[in-house]
Design a protein with these regions (language model features):
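Generic alpha-helix detector with strongest preference for long hydrophobic helices that associate
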Residues: 10, 60-64, 91-95, 126, ...
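Secreted/periplasmic proteins that engage bacterial cell-wall peptidoglycan
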Residues: 71-135
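Intrinsically disordered, low-complexity
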Residues: 2-91, 166-192
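...with weaker cross-activation on analogous glycine-rich loops/strands in unrelated enzymes
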Residues: 80, 112, 118-192
């Protein structure tokens, strides 16, 4: 049993390293910077994300925490774990903008926090600039919906949002209820 865990750890570390190396060039390209030499901005073929239909995360309704689905890419697990770390913190307008660490978060601060943990964002963004983050369209694992006044994300099928739309409470929380993206720019990270 110990040997199997060791093998899984090597695969996981290799996956994380591959994710880091592959996203380094596309990270700059997707956030308006320059792509690394030899990389192609927006090239969805350079992804370490698995092929096939992604599984959905589960919401523990007692704790409000998200449970990553089996086989989720390391970046998705990191995003979910980051969301769990600030889940239930108070809504604070402008929270999470000056720094990823804050006593409370607003919508774009909370979205920036999970994207940063996934290696998809280097500094916090307000909701307006999130409208041009990544590439257009819905992602397989992570999607960001943003307009000039609000931003939220869907990570492995769960909504990460500070608004009480469809369920009670404000502040960063996982929500099982869906929200139509009408009026929002829908964006994703290449391969996710």
């Amino acid at each position: 049993m110990g040997r199997i865990k060791c093998v899984r750890m090597r695969v996981s570390l290799a996956g994380v390293l591959a994710l880091f190396l592959l996203s380094a060039g596309s990270a700059a390209a997707q956030t308006g910077g320059s792509a690394a030499p030899g990389s192609t901005a927006g090239d969805s073929t350079t992804s370490s994300a698995p092929v096939g239909k992604p599984r959905k995360a589960k919401l523990n309704r007692k704790t409000g925490m998200a449970i990553p689905p089996p086989g989720a890419p390391a970046a998705v697990v990191a995003a979910i774990n980051a969301g769990n770390a600030i889940n239930g913190r108070p809504y604070v307008w402008g929270g999470g903008h000056g720094s990823f660490e804050s006593r409370g978060y607003d919508c774009s601060g909370a979205v920036s926090y999970v994207l940063h943990a996934a290696g998809m964002l280097s500094s916090p963004l307000p909701s307006g600039p999130l409208m041009s983050w990544g590439v257009p369209g819905k992602g397989r694992w992570i999607s960001v919906m943003a307009n000039q006044g609000h931003a939220y994300a869907v990570v492995a099928g769960l909504r990460w949002d500070t608004s009480s739309y469809g369920s009670g409470g404000s502040g960063p929380r996982w929500r099982a209820t869906k929200r139509r993206p009408h009026g929002f720019a829908v964006r994703h990270w290449t391969g996710y």
